[in-house]
Amino acid sequence: MYAIIKHSGKQYKVSVGDELKLDHFEAESKASIEVSEVLAINDKELKVGAPFVAGAKVVLEVINHGKDKKVVIYKKRRRKDSKLKRGFRRQFTRVVVKDIKA
């Protein structure tokens, strides 16, 4: 059994027990989150929503929050003695799929 969910503008294919790294959102650790934006669900037969499957929910549990590795952005303009170096660390929320309700 799997489901395709939409969270913060991105789509994820999930099954029970899967661990996901989603974009950061405000929630406490060990909190349960219900996602009702289920695009498709496969439980013996495939149900595709228009745009969402009616009555379907996916229950997620927040494990922790964190930051990815730093991405360094470096720009250099040749012969101009001009350069720019910046770093960026994306924040994420790690969740585990507890239940899929059809």
Swiss-Prot record:
One of its GO terms (cellular component) is ribosome. SUPFAM superfamilies: L21p-like. GO terms for biological process: translation. InterPro entries: bL21-like, bL21-like_sf, Ribosomal_bL21, Ribosomal_bL21_CS. It comes from the Bacteria. GO terms for molecular function: rRNA binding; structural constituent of ribosome. Keywords: Ribonucleoprotein, Ribosomal protein, RNA-binding, rRNA-binding. NCBIfam families: L21 (TIGR00061). Part of the 50S ribosomal subunit. Contacts protein L20. This protein binds to 23S rRNA in the presence of protein L20. PANTHER family: 50S RIBOSOMAL PROTEIN L21 (PTHR21349), LARGE RIBOSOMAL SUBUNIT PROTEIN BL21M (PTHR21349:SF0). Belongs to the bacterial ribosomal protein bL21 family. This is Large ribosomal subunit protein bL21. The gene is rplU.
